[in-house]
Amino acid sequence: MPFLTGASITRIGGLFTTGKLLFYPIRNNIDGDGNQLINWVVEFFSDKYEPADWSRLGDVNEVLAHFESWRFDWFDPPTIMRNADFVLTYPMVDRDPIAQWTFDRVTLLGDAAHPMYPRGGNGGAQSILDAAALTRHLVKAASPLEALRAYEAERLAPTRAIVLQNRTAPPDLIIDTVEQRANKQKFDRLEDVISREELMAISQNYQQVAGWDRASLKAKTV
């Protein structure tokens, strides 16, 4: 059945200490009884290294070994994990930004151009923006070569900034900051640990880098 509001995105835990859970609904009433299809992601550090394979099936028991005790009166992550149709496992890695995407009539787009930690939805979102920019320049430019150069000029620098930002100050920074300051002590008011002004500053800084802030979006529509 739906949890919290039925449209809640739930993050629990810190990557650098406990591991992290992320749960969110992606489809309502999948069975006629009001149940939702839930997507979940867990992250934890591991000494095991395997070559990157984005379609490798994982073992849910390996995941549960880290999160079996994570049960709450409003939410039961282990039960949701056990009911998964399948589990995929892959390394959370990026690559250093490169200086050039376009080579004659060939250019790069998406993860081929700027593989990044998928924070803030940017793993897929920036690929969509790449495609939109490339399409726009192919329609407007005098030649395909000119279009590819213009596309690279528009998209290379912004995506480079996001790749680097996701390494040092991703949206997870809010959780990590609160966890560090709370020092394993319970609190009733978030404002006692971090101010609203700090929360807004972290959020707005990331929005500006990603190009989601109000000023950037308004400029694109003018």
Predicted segments with their positions:
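Conserved FAD-binding catalytic core of PHBH/FMO-like flavoproteins
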Residues: 1-75, 79-84
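Conserved mid-domain beta->alpha element of the FAD-binding
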Residues: 62, 86-172
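Residue-level signal for alpha-helical context at structural boundaries
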Residues: 58, 81, 85, 169, ...
